[in-house]
Amino acid sequence: MQHLKTKYLDLPDARLAYCEQGEGPYLVLLHGNSESKRIFSKYQQEDFKGFTTLALDSRGHGETQSDDDELTIEKFSEDVIEFCHRKGIQKAFVIGYSDGGNIALFLARKAPDLFPRLVAISPNTLASGTEPGTLRLFQNLQRMMLFLKRLGFNTKKYLMRLDLMLTDIGLTGDDLNSIQASVKIIYAEKDMIKEEHIRYIADQIPGASLDKIADCNHMNV
């Protein structure tokens, strides 16, 4: 499997890094928190050959360059929309994993004509939708990073990423109910997102389909 070349596209306040592969309808791939576009390299080369795949690095992740004091899922979604506009893309499918799934929910609401069909893997709209043990882990990591910051270490990027997992993303039930795009939600049998929360999201989105994958967890769904 070859190492896909990183390309860049300039936005007004960021330089988005991405890998492009294949030919066919556009398929945008969105990674999770503290990951990068590289998690999709194998799929781009082996599984999605019938598509022009575009795996993006979100702000504060991978090789994307930006100077931010805060990261938000909504801002990530705005970057994806602007990216597609600047690439001249009029229609694209989306697969988003974890935080990428959260981005996909925003895209479904904001731009259903541009993104008519989306797959959101293990999304959550509320921080409280995370299993309590995992949420405590994130909170402990945040305290550790704040302690290291006081000692003079540069933990800004880590703290911004942790804030994403400890903050509601900003989509209400009414927002989800207004989604017009076709949305499929996938989650793991042993997911770190509460099953009742994922079912709540699916129930709020008109016509959304929901699949649970057996014998896997959030990290290998």
What are these model-predicted stretches?
Residues 148-174, 190:
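Hydrophobic, aromatic-rich cap/lid helix
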Residues 192-197:
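Conserved alpha/beta-hydrolase "acid-adjacent" motif
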Residues 216-221:
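Catalytic histidine-centered segment of alpha/beta-hydrolase-like enzymes
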Residues 14-63:
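Conserved HGGG/HGGXW glycine-rich cap/lid loop of the alpha/beta-hydrolase fold
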Residues 179, 185-187:
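Short beta-strand/loop motif that positions the catalytic acidic residue
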Residues 54-93:
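Active-site loop/oxyanion-hole signature of alpha/beta-hydrolase fold enzymes
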Residues 33, 92, 96-101:
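Conserved alpha/beta-hydrolase "nucleophile elbow" surrounding the catalytic nucleophile
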Residues 102-110, 118-145:
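Flexible "cap/lid" loop of the alpha/beta hydrolase fold
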